[in-house]
């Protein structure tokens, strides 16, 4: 279990080690190293998802490790409350950023090993704190430099606890 201690409350997450082993290992490594401490949910879209894991307050981007293989063909779906890896348009480009689905997002699911079909790898789910996620999804957002949908007031992951 992983707990994000945010300035809006705690979000408790259960990982799917058996379905996305490389992705879960990558995520837990970042958690244990303290990478996510004092990072923000930098992209919040009500009716879609909340994204974090890559920026500090002030939209300062963090350096990451090498990208990992996309394990989206694991049978898991991007349903409300699941966590998936964020990435660029390249299927195997995920590093540290993740998002929490606030609705079912079927269009993000794996449909085939093509550029459009790879989808986004689900690797965990919220088991407690969806009320916190729902609070976050409703914050006021705007533009920050080249970025859209950025909370006007920082939504901060203050610290992360990993319990085996």
UniProtKB/Swiss-Prot annotation:
This is Peptidyl-prolyl cis-trans isomerase B. PROSITE patterns: CSA_PPIASE_1 (PS00170), CSA_PPIASE_2 (PS50072). It comes from the Bacteria. GO terms for biological process: chaperone-mediated protein folding. Residues 1-162 form the PPIase cyclophilin-type domain. It is found in: Cytoplasm. Its EC number is 5.2.1.8. It catalyses: [protein]-peptidylproline (omega=180) = [protein]-peptidylproline (omega=0). One of its GO terms (cellular component) is cytosol. Belongs to the cyclophilin-type PPIase family. Inhibition by cyclosporin A with a Ki of 25 to 50 mu-mol, a concentration 1000-fold higher than that required for eukaryotic PPIases. PPIases accelerate the folding of proteins. It catalyzes the cis-trans isomerization of proline imidic peptide bonds in oligopeptides.
């Amino acid at each position: 279990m992983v707990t994000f201690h945010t300035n809006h409350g705690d979000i408790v997450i259960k990982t799917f080690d058996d379905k996305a082993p490389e992705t879960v290992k990558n995520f837990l490594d970042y958690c244990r190293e303290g990478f996510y401490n004092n990072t923000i949910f930098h992209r919040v879209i009500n009716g879609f998802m909340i994204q974090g894991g890559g920026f500090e307050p002030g939209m300062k981007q963090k350096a990451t490790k090498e990208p990992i293989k996309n394990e989206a063909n694991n049978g898991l779906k991007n349903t409300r409350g699941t966590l998936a890896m964020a990435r660029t348009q390249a299927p195997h480009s995920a590093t540290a950023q993740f998002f929490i689905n606030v609705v079912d997002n079927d269009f993000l699911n794996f449909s085939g090993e093509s550029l459009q079909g790879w989808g986004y790898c689900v690797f965990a789910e919220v088991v407690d704190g969806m009320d916190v996620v729902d609070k976050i999804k409703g914050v006021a957002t705007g533009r920050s430099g080249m970025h859209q949908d950025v909370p006007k007031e920082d939504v901060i992951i203050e610290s992360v606890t990993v319990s085996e």
